[in-house]
Amino acid sequence: MSAIVDIVGREILDSRGNPTVECDVLLESGVMGRAAVPSGASTGSREAIELRDGDKSRYLGKGVLKAVGYINNEISEAVLGLDASEQAFLDRTLIELDGTENKSRLGANAMLAVSMAVARAAAEEAGLPLYRYFGGMAAVQMPVPMMNVINGGEHANNNLDLQELMIIPLGAPSFREALRYGAEVFHALKKILHDKGISTAVGDEGGFAPNVPGGHEAAIQMILEAIDKAGYVAGEQIALGLDCAASEFYKDGKYELSGEGLSLSAQEWTDMLATWVDKYPIISIEDGMAEGDWDGWKILTDRLGKNVQIVGDDLFVTNTKILKEGIDKGIANSILIKINQIGTLTETFAAIEMAKRAGYTAVISHRSGETEDSTIADIAVGTNAGQIKTGSLSRSDRMAKYNQLLRIEEDLGEVASYPGRSAFYNLR
């Protein structure tokens, strides 16, 4: 038995300079696990609640001392003495202790920090790398990265309404090479922007955040130019992905693309996306419709779902109840997995498993407010998810995940596999 003998929560800062929760869990053997939780900017309304202090005199009200206090007192009292290797029982204990549907009493940030730290301690106790602890001997598949090279929406202060324009190196032979493809395109894009006199400042997730004359299509065309200049073939070696984060520009039943001067119905917005899919090698569209516009989601899925990965993020918020409803109604064909949307590892793994059983893909994801914690890299490999979304090729909070994946691929050696296009098994 790996009994938990001490838990310490603390307030640290994330990549945006906002407070977040970190937790240390100490086991009887002397082994310790540490984990820190991320935070999002564009959030789904049905996400588990992130507990903030609301004290405007500290960190503009964004302090997390309440959540830390729950870890150091109430949660600590409930889990001391529990076996760290019994993750499902520990997570159930946390859920029952909170007692709310959306984790609003203790806070998903407090609960997740404990859940992750316990898993790290248990893996260390077992003498296993975290990905192997999660997935056993079957954990051999590296994820295809979705790399956010141009930021817009809530992640940048520019004229782009869409939140992320991504490159997806699905033609690479290995994860290491996929990362190289991405880095070389990133640097090619930087030079293109510089030569055009466009800002090369980066946004929250490390992608460039320029005002782009000509809007979204001009931005897509610059990415395609960068792919070509880096020596790769768009569509064959590197595909494109979009995160629309459409809830952020959905107003009164219309999709208000202010940067384009457009106000569109769900049908018109779908037509516009379909036009882009026809013109450009776009293989994935995330949150193409607002989270509450299920009719719009159905239109989008029916129109593009056979050829394009249609990912639900704000739509599903890593919640199995909502995901099941989407599966039953034929909404989307993929789920974005964000551990802090649901608040425990056990519930996270349940959402991944449900998606796979239904033929949906599961894309493991970071948040825009990140830390040096690299747990999601281990989750991506441990669950054989096949895809990961963890930002651009800059900012150490993003690179921490990529570098951990490099280490995992090295550790796996010859048994490591890189799925490439087959990671998109939801497409026909």
Swiss-Prot record:
One of its GO terms (biological process) is glycolytic process. Keywords: Cytoplasm, Glycolysis, Lyase, Magnesium, Metal-binding, Secreted. The active site is at E205, K338. It is an enzyme of class 4 (lyase). Its cofactor is Mg(2+). Coiled coil: none annotated. Mg(2+) binds at D243, E286, D313. It catalyses: (2R)-2-phosphoglycerate = phosphoenolpyruvate + H2O. (2R)-2-phosphoglycerate binds at Q163, K338, R367, S368, K389. NCBIfam families: eno. This is Enolase. The gene is eno.
